[in-house]
Amino acid sequence: MGTGRLPNLHDSGAMTPPPTPTKGSHSKSDSASSLRGSFDSVRRGNAITYRCKPSIDEKETPGSTEPRHFPYWTTDYEIEVDHKGRKRPLGCGAWSNVCRATPRPPKLEGLAPLNTVPGVDMTPPVTPVHSRNSSRSEAQVPQIPSAYAVKEPCGRTAQRVLGDECRILSYLSRYPDAEKYIVPFYGQDTRTDALVLGLMDGTLEDWIQKDLDSLSEESRAAKLAHVFPTLAAHLLDGFIWISEKHCTHGDLKPANILISSTPSSATSTSTSPPHAVYTDFSSAILSTSSTSSSPVGGATYDFLDPALMTKASASTLPTPQTDLWSLAVTLLVLAIGSSPYSRVTSNEFMKKECIKQGTPLAYMRQGENGTRNGKRMDALEGSLGFDVEEWLGLVLVKDVMKRAGVDKWRAELGSGGAKMGLRI
């Protein structure tokens, strides 16, 4: 999404397989029947968990950048199409199209020998069984959801981009709490190079447009005040979690944050703030990888740190500090409902010059939406009893040396939350 892009820029309930079956104890039809039974459960809305061979699990150690491959020899999916058999993309980008897919059993008849699948030993598909003693963390156990989002590459360059993104998602997904902060990742399909991800309700950009801006100003203000502190705190915690893994996202914006309105925990209710996770790591950089290269993906101008827009910074790569700027602009957009540079959207050159000034808080009050933006910010602050604009201004200052670090910024939000009677 966005208007312009810069080039370059598992407990006792686990389900585990029995020992490798012999020809007399595990026939092909038995395996297919068991798999179909499992998928019937998925179609009823249940997620099932299965465990791969130990030789595969060893690669799931936190810190490993070994690409995670989607186990289509055990479970497969089918891209949803319209009545004419055409794929219906959920979203389209510079490098890929994302389509909705439904889990289904693998086509055993046409399955290639498993010893030809990268990283897989020659063993028949396993039947999920209940294990009483499971020591692996749930974060390392693949689950079959009710639906996938399949990110398919567009062209050869896109294959490289998705390959790099696969390594970063594989790396991050192996750490505990990954699914709290990043999109669920099931692996790369080696048949097509597509990335198989968890399906969410939509993006933060969609949520702002459909769930906030469609309301009356009074209702919008009330709903925003209810969700803003918790959502901002969660996104900041996710930002810190990713940064601690030595990863820089490189393209933070509402379109790259996925939202789920479904209660995510036992304490969640239908009125709880939506759960948000980061997605689209096509522009990300992993500083721990000795084989990492400059990202081919790009960043979106409206959310780009002005420090990356000078001639001297032409070859400069994104950093956690530039990511923090992008997150701050993202939260500003959440507050006011549009880009602070919306008044110059039609003039790309002028917009770039405005962004270089490093004063998005000043620009948000200008143009035909300026008055509305100011009223929305004032209403949010009045409802919360917290100076949101001043808080955003701790980061949204052009001079990098004068910006607050992420720890201070998070602490200030926590202090503000305490004044609101919130623990965030």
Q: What is the role of each PLM region?
A:
Residues 95-167, 171:
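ATP-binding glycine-rich loop module of kinase domains
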Residues 184-193:
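Short beta-strand micro-motifs within the conserved protein kinase catalytic domain, predominantly
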Residues 231-232:
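Activation segment signature within eukaryotic-like protein kinase domains
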Residues 235-247:
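Protein kinase catalytic-loop region centered on the HRD/HxD motif
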Residues 255-303:
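Activation segment/activation loop of eukaryotic-type protein kinase catalytic domains
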Residues 309-325, 329-377:
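Conserved C-lobe activation region of Hanks-type protein kinase-like domains
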